[in-house]
Every structure is written in C-alpha cells, then in structure tokens.
C-alpha cells in the first residue's frame, strides 16, 4: 500500500499544464465526438462551465494535506483515547473512467501527546477526494498523511463508497458498495484496538 501512495504523481504549475483555452477546446472536441454541435445555443458556454466545475472538483491537486494537518493541539486534560470522526461524506472520481465515486470515510487515531482539530480530518478527506482516485489509494493516502504528520499511536481509516463506473456502465450493478481499510500502529498490531474501532462504527449505525 505504501507503494500506491509514494508513486502517486502530481502535476505542478511548471510541468506543462494546459491553459484554460486549451482545456475548453478539449471539451468541444469531446462534444463533437459524442455527436453534438458545441456551437448550438445550449452548449456554447458548456466548455467554460465544465472547466470551472473541474477546477473545483479536482482542486485537491493544488492542496497539500500536510499543510492542513500542520497545526495540532496539546491534549485537553490528558485525553489519550481513541478519536473517531465517522461518516465524513465525500465525492471523488474514478481514475479509470472519470465518473463519480460517492462515499463516506471513517477516520480514527490514538493520540500520542497531540490532537487535531476535528475539521482537519474532514479537510484531509476532501483533499484526496478531489483528485482522480482509486478507493484503495485514497484510503492509504488519508492514513499516511495523518500518521506521518501527527505521529499518533495508530491510525484507522475505513471508506465505504459506491462507484458509478459499476452502476452507470459495464455490469450496471447499482447500489453495490466497496469497503476498504488501512490500519497503522496499534490499530495494525493490536487486534483489540482494531476490533474496538470496528465496534464503535457498528455502535453508531
């Protein structure tokens, strides 16, 4: 799983990213390929709208999770037990077909002297969701970012998601859910901690 995370390439502004005009022209090409006339009234502004929406949908490429996680807090009153953020909703896109992945993430960690603001976990999920993804890679990336930045005693991440590439095309199995997990530290080495994480998730259902 580490290889998945380490080999995840990102473009920077100097690596030949197309201009806004070039991106809009690419949308026009796709419209023509689909059999449409991109100059007709209803589609004239579609290329600009698509690129504007893609800038938001794929905005995670311009954000760094470690920057979001950089500010931590000393534990309040000596709290050192599990911190669990459950049912964090997200929308992502499959890197194979560029269609939506709709799901929720459950993220837990065992503090080791420092804690995160609760919103930081949701923001990290959002950063990785707003990229072309596989669910396996996204699960590992969230866990790794928290583990390396916070250095907790352990991190647990579970993602449940529906992949519209399975619902809209191909085998067309609407409603099927994919579940992935990544565990580090005590959650990986101590079965009791992993079981407690799973029990807490079931208890909140």
UniProtKB/Swiss-Prot annotation:
According to its UniProt record, the EC number is: 3.5.4.16
Query: Can you say what this protein is called?
Result: GTP cyclohydrolase 1
The reaction(s) annotated as catalysed by this protein in its Swiss-Prot or TrEMBL entry are: GTP + H2O = 7,8-dihydroneopterin 3'-triphosphate + formate + H(+)
Q: Which organism is it from?
A: Sinorhizobium fredii (strain NBRC 101917 / NGR234)
What superkingdom heads the lineage? Bacteria
Keyword Nucleotide-binding attached? yes
HAMAP family, alphabetized: FolE
Choose one Gene Ontology CC annotation of this protein and give it: cytoplasm
User: What's an example GO BP annotation here?
Assistant: one-carbon metabolic process
Which residues does the record give as Zn(2+) binding sites? Answer: 94, 97, 165
**GO terms assigned for molecular function:** GTP binding; GTP cyclohydrolase I activity; zinc ion binding
Q: Which Pfam families match?
A: GTP_cyclohydroI
